[in-house]
Design a protein with these regions (language model features):
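Eukaryotic tandem repeat interaction scaffolds
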Residues: 62, 83-156
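Repeated scaffold domains used in trafficking and secretory/extracellular systems
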Residues: 20-29, 65-76, 109-121, 146-156, ...
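Short loop/turn segments that connect beta-strands within beta-propeller blades
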Residues: 5-7, 52-54, 98-101, 135-137, ...
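Blade-level signature of beta-propeller repeat domains, shared across WD40, Kelch, NHL, RCC1
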Residues: 194-222
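Acidic, glycine-anchored loop motifs typical of Ca2+
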Residues: 32-37, 75-83, 118-125, 156-162, ...
Length: 222
């Protein structure tokens, strides 16, 4: 294994050359309490918590049957209150503390077909055809007609939060605005999760999504 900087150059001094099994997804970097933590989950159910040199910073005491959901870090007021959240293959939430233990006092059971993300202080949960968002700016419950939903993405544009998600079966792209309203005119045609951005830096928001054969669609958001 190698660590690269933002320019694609290998970082010297990286100690971890090989894991005991295949990495499930790319390593993720978090800063907690001013210290670097690099998380790397393996097929053999091992969670590596490393420092920026690739050395073990925290040894996790138990094995975890990782699902396809990426690891999330929920930051508390202190390191002791901060936890790594993993959803295992049975749909159970595993709360890994930064002393290497797993806190089983807080347990949530989800459907195995779950997508969970924690971003911008918001919990985003997709179970089947249901979307649930909970956080400081957005609190949203929405049920779609199908379970064929893309991963949801949260954006902060012009000091407002927007969430995009796409029903890939019907090719309908949805855009929600804080706290819980669908943007007027949506859903629109699209096959991929859209991006909300002020493309021209003119205070007007664009919504970009792709259709068949990679064709891009640029919608104006009212």
């Amino acid at each position: 294994h190698y660590m690269y900087d933002k320019n694609g150059k290998i970082i010297n001094g990286w100690k971890l050359k090989q894991t005991k099994s295949k990495a499930l997804y790319p390593a993720e970097h978090f800063v907690v309490g001013g210290r670097d933590y690099i998380l790397l989950a393996e097929e053999n159910r091992t969670l590596n918590i490393l420092n920026r040199r690739g050395e073990t910073r925290v040894k996790v005491k138990e094995k975890i049957d990782f699902s396809s959901n990426k690891l999330q870090v929920v930051k508390g007021k202190s390191l002791a209150e901060t936890r790594i959240i993993a959803i295992d293959k049975k749909g159970a939430q595993q709360n890994i503390l930064f002393d290497g233990s797993i806190d089983n006092s807080i347990q949530f059971e989800f459907d195995q077909n779950i997508q969970y993300t924690y971003t911008k202080q918001h919990h985003i949960l997709i179970e089947g055809e249901d979307l649930k968002v909970n956080g400081p700016q957005m609190n949203l419950l929405y049920s779609f007609e199908n379970e064929s939903l893309s991963a949801a993405k949260l954006f902060n544009v012009e000091n407002e939060h927007y969430l995009s998600i796409t029903d890939t079966k019907t090719a309908e792209a949805y855009l929600f605005r804080e706290p819980n309203e669908m943007v007027e005119g949506f859903p629109m045609y699209g096959k991929t999760t859209g991006i909300a951005e002020d493309m021209n830096l003119d205070g007007k928001i664009n919504f970009i999504t792709a259709g068949e054969s990679g064709t891009l669609y640029n919608y104006a958001v009212e």
